[in-house]
Every structure is written in structure tokens, then in C-alpha cells.
Amino acid sequence: MRKTVIVAMSGGVDSSVVAYLLKKQGKYDVIGLFMKNWEEQDENGECTATKDFLDVEQIAEQLSIPYYTVSFAKEYKERVFSRFLKEYTNGYTPNPDVLCNREIKFDLLQKKVRELKGDFLATGHYCRGGLDGTGLFRGVDPNKDQSYFLCGTPKEALSNVLFPLGGMYKTEVRQLAIEAGLATATKKDSTGICFIGKRPFKSFLEQFVPNSPGDIVDFDTQKVVGCHEGAHYYTIGQRRGLNVGGMEKPCYVLGKDMQKNVVYIVRGEDHPLLYRKELIAKELNWFVPLQGSITCSAKVRYRSPDEKCSVYPLEDGTVQVVFDIPVKAVTPGQTVAFYQGDVCLGGGVIAVPMIHQL
């Protein structure tokens, strides 16, 4: 009996190629499923979800596969967006894409897959699953690898997931779409956080979090050098948008004191206080059980390089991560992913103090 695979289709070229490849294999009954997570219009007054769904319809018709749509807009606001706002208000810099994968795509969407009697869920993520269906590996394209965004998803939620693009380069995917004549072959990739789109981040956030003006302080001199409209708008390592003039060197955000509503800056991109030798990570998820301390590498941001480190489990369920070489702009609230070679061991949320303890 043929197995049924549900393809999470976004209206983009990646998920279109996933559906095409699985249909071409001929061993699956392929069903497309479009997931809508956000109701509002973009900065031009257009509903991007509607445009994306029309592309899904077109691809499904090209491939002669059935397709459905499901809205998780209410659940997304409750389980992802509300936490995103809370974290920012408290001075952290969360990664909503990691949270969306855990709470929506590989939880609620998996339930919909079961409702549709699907045996597998397939997505357009550039990563690879383990042979037993419960591991996670980097995608072969180092520029597109998305295992970082899945490091917080429980391994059980990935046990039936197919990643057809994990062994491909983006250029190959795009070329295949062109050769197959897929309607989305030349469609631009989506960028940024889905609910923000192309809008400036600050103008979006101030719709939900009121401005709270305060001082910008030079940490070395403890002198006020500027003012800000809200400490929550700034993240560690940030350079742009500080509006601090008269400095010999570029200024960077060192940290924030949310109780005092102060943003601390330092001068120079190589200022030693911008670098941290260690961090504490919480809310951990492991694909490979942590049996005592380990040596591995870690990514503290999606586009950051791998940093060699040692990981030590602590009694409260968190871990201490000690880097071989100090790492720049370690940011509370961001995701840290752990690797040994191509194997993603797991990940967690960075929970270091806001201000360096000197």
C-alpha cells in the first residue's frame, strides 16, 4: 500500500520543488498543505498569505495533487508572537523562527497531518534527518543549512519528517524548478520574520510596545552620550541606529539594564567587553542525550560561525558553555545550537546576564 506524504507548502520555490520531487518518485500519494500563521496585511496593504496561497494552488494544479489550507493564526499569536513580545519587553532578543518550528510546524501541523491520514510530513528545510528518523544533520549547502532553526524541536516531532532538499544546494533547487517549469521557479525567497515582512523592525515593534525614552551610557566612562526611545529596541552587538555622535570609534551595544532603562555602549568593534568566554543555556532540547560534559561546537546566531566549546550540565537543568576562544555579541534570548561535525546535538536559549559582571 502506498504511503501518503503531506508537503508543507508555503508558495515558495523550495516547498514547490519538494512536492515535485516526491510526486516524481512515484511511490507516494502526495498532498499539499498550506499553513497560514498571520492575518494582517503587509506594508503595502496586501495580504501576502493570499498571494502565497495562490502560488500553492498553481503548483498543486501543475503537479495534479490535492491541497488543503489550515489557519493557525490564533495559535501562532498565543504560542509564538505573545512570547516574542514578552521577551523583547524584558530585554531579550528571541528567535521566533525556532519557536514557530517547535510550537506550530512540528506540533500543530503534525496533528493536521494525522487528521489527513498522512504517513509523513515533508518540508523545504535545508537539513537532513537521521536514518532512524529521530536525528538531525546539517544540510549539505553550508550557506542554506537550516538545522539551527530546528535545534529546539523535540526529536519525536521529527520522526516522520522528510527533508528532500537536505542533500541539495539552493542553486540546484532553483535550476530544477526552472527545468520543471514550476510556476514559482523565479519567485524571490522570503526574508526576515514572517509577521514583520519588509517593514523596519522598530516601526513594527512600536505598534505593540510603547516607547520608553532613556539614556545611552558609555560603559567605560559611565557618561551619558545619547538617548534612546526604548531599551527593548536594541540588541547586544548592534551598531546601527544608536544616534551617538562625536566618537572616535564606532559604538556598539554592550548590554541593557531594563530596570534603569539604560542602554550601555562601548567604543570599537574589538572592545574586549563585547566578547564572552562562556554562557548559560536553558530550555534545552537534545537529539543526542547529554551524558556528562562534552566537547563540540556551537552557533550563537544563525549566521555565526561554529565556535569550539565544552558543555557542562548543571544541576538545575541548564548547561554551562565554555568557548575555546571568546565569542562576540553573545545575546540573551537567542538560540544556541550544538554540533559535532554535521550532527546537530540539540540546542537551547541563551540565558547569560544582561550586563557584564566586572
Swiss-Prot record:
Signal peptide: none annotated. One of its GO terms (molecular function) is ATP binding. ATP binds at residues 8-15, 35, 124. GO terms for biological process: tRNA wobble position uridine thiolation. Its EC number is 2.8.1.13. Residues 95-97 are annotated as: Interaction with target base in tRNA. The record marks 125, 334 as: Interaction with tRNA. This is tRNA-specific 2-thiouridylase MnmA. It is found in: Cytoplasm. CDD domains: MnmA_TRMU-like. It holds the Pfam family tRNA_Me_trans_C.
